[in-house]
Design a protein with these regions (language model features):
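Membrane-interface loop-to-helix entry segments
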Residues: 132-194, 226, 249-253, 257, ...
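C-terminal membrane-solvent junction of multi-pass transporters and transport-like membrane proteins
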Residues: 160, 343-352, 393-459, 494-496
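Hydrophobic transmembrane alpha-helices that form the core helical bundles
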Residues: 40, 53, 62-147, 152, ...
Length: 497
């Protein structure tokens, strides 16, 4: 368990400032999902369907963040939802969530260093070095940023996120000017909202088809918002979690509204859903297909592709930086909760969990080597992590529901909570249901057409049996049970000052 005493050599340090937490929250919302694949959402469901999907997922994320914010303010710990699940639901759930989340980020970091090499290779002079060399260089940089004090991580993420925020704001301004013909030389207006079958489209014009298409975009939107739960992990090293966490959580909804929904609206107004360009940029080689690049280029910015590639490179590095931070802190916190070996709890004088960092970095490197030597094995490893983020969100909603019920059952006054999530119990229940819908809906052919591709089903849902393996292993070995509400540990053994 993390501790606020900076004199304790075995604990992380509370050196993340409020501005760090707030910007990390923004950075968690903005990434390559917005810059690279947002056009696919419009192409699949039309501008109306895409906006509805992002609003629904945005609402779900808002409820999840308010749930996480209430628990993180009450008990700020780097273990976040893993610790909360262990205390408020079942230790086996906390064990499974923690290892599941660590596993997810380890794979993500390995994928990010590979993607960063692809982004760099967009510029021809950079191709003098092979991809693997660039990947290793970026991995060393990320490890270096995480090996120093948490202030270094906070500062690096602050500037990474600021770059993304500035780009989105400029994009919205340029987009609005282009819509009204001030830039680009042509008035576009709102005609693209009704082109063809827009604003809502499907395989045909029936309402059911349009609804299914919109539900399909839920998956794209859900992946775009992965990482927002980092707010909870940073609580363990926040200077003033009782102030910084609620502040960050309260701003999440508005950030989602501005940065995602308005961006989707601008793209939908400027590029018709029928455009093949909206099929998306799946790699750095296709950066010219990014909807952001297309809008900037149509507005007259000749270097749009190069600039957006630089922004996407910073987004990838930011994701890798945050991923290594999150996985390292999760492993550290699990050791404190006796869900991992005690050696992973060792820290440097700067408060860096050095053993957890080394172990995590080694696994990242091994997965990177697998990617170089066996593409098939790497594909299955990546597939295994596909649902872990959504499973973590399920854990957050369930933990908060149990926390609030236990808090009331034990006779505590809700007014004593320094931050209280609104809309309880409706909020976590809605989030829980939407998470389940997104998880079940991963295989769109199975859901919409009843076509069973067992190889595809195995790859798509591989994360579920892996999570169940962790859960059942711990439950069988330690014979844990659902904690009765009156026995739930509501102590605050984290010294918050």
């Amino acid at each position: 368990m993390t501790n606020n005493s900076n004199n304790n050599a075995n604990e992380v340090k509370r050196n993340l400032r409020s501005r760090h937490i707030s910007m990390i929250a923004i950075g968690g919302c903005i990434g390559s999902g917005l810059f690279m694949t947002s056009g696919q959402a419009i192409h699949s469901a039309g501008p109306g369907g895409a906006i509805v999907a992002y609003l629904c997922i945005g609402l779900m994320v808002y409820f999840l963040m308010t749930s996480l914010g209430e628990m993180a303010t009450y008990l700020p710990t780097s273990g976040s939802f893993s610790t909360y699940a262990s205390r408020y639901v079942d230790p086996s759930l906390g064990f499974a969530l923690g290892w599941n989340y660590w596993f997810n980020w380890v794979i993500t970091v390995a994928a990010d260093v590979e993607l960063s090499a692809l982004a760099v290779s967009y510029w021809e002079p950079m191709r003098v070095l092979p991809h693997w060399a660039w990947s290793l260089l970026f991995l060393v940089i990320i490890i270096g940023l995480n090996s120093l004090s948490v202030k270094v991580y906070g500062e690096s993420e602050y500037w990474f996120a600021l770059i993304k925020v500035v780009v989105v704001i400029v994009f919205l301004i340029v987009g609005c000017l282009t819509i009204f013909g001030i830039l680009g030389g042509e008035y576009i207006g709102f005609k693209n909202l009704t082109v063809g079958d827009a604003p809502f489209i499907g395989e045909d014009t029936s309402l059911s088809s349009q609804i299914l298409a919109t539900l399909g975009v839920f998956l794209i939107a859900g992946y775009s918002f992965q990482g927002t739960e980092l707010i909870g992990i940073t609580a363990g090293e926040s200077e003033e979690p009782e102030k910084s966490i609620p502040k960050a959580v309260k701003q999440v909804f508005w950030r989602i509204l501005i940065f995602y929904v308005l961006a989707i609206l601008v793209i939908g107004l400027l590029i018709p859903y029928t455009s093949p360009d909206l099929l998306g940029a799946e790699s750095a080689e296709e950066i010219a297909k990014s909807p952001f690049t297309i809008v900037f280029k149509n507005a007259g910015f000749a270097l749009a592709a190069s600039v957006m590639n630089a922004v996407i490179l910073t987004s990838i590095l930011s994701a890798g930086n945050s991923g290594l931070y999150a996985s390292t802190r999760m492993l550290y916190a699990m050791s404190k909760e006796k869900l991992a070996y005690p050696i992973f709890g060792r820290v440097t004088k700067y408060g860096t969990p050095v053993v957890s960092l080394i172990a995590t970095s080694v696994v990242v490197f091994l997965i990177f080597l697998i990617q170089l030597t066996s593409a098939n094995a790497y594909t299955y490893i990546v597939a295994a992590s596909g649902l872990t983020g959504f499973i973590a969100w399920l854990g957050i909603a369930l933990s908060h529901y149990r926390f609030r019920r236990a808090y009331v059952a034990q006779g505590k006054d809700l007014n004593d909570l320094k931050y209280r999530a609104k809309w309880f119990p409706l909020g976590p229940i809605i989030a829980l249901v939407l998470c389940i819908i997104v998880i079940i809906g991963q295989d769109t052919e199975l859901i919409t057409k009843g076509i069973v591709n067992w190889s595809g089903v195995l790859t798509t849902y591989m994360g579920v049996p892996i999570f169940l393996f962790f859960f059942l292993y711990h439950k069988i070995r330690y014979k844990t049970k659902l904690i009765p509400l009156d026995k739930v540990d509501l102590s605050q053994d984290v010294d918050v000052k």
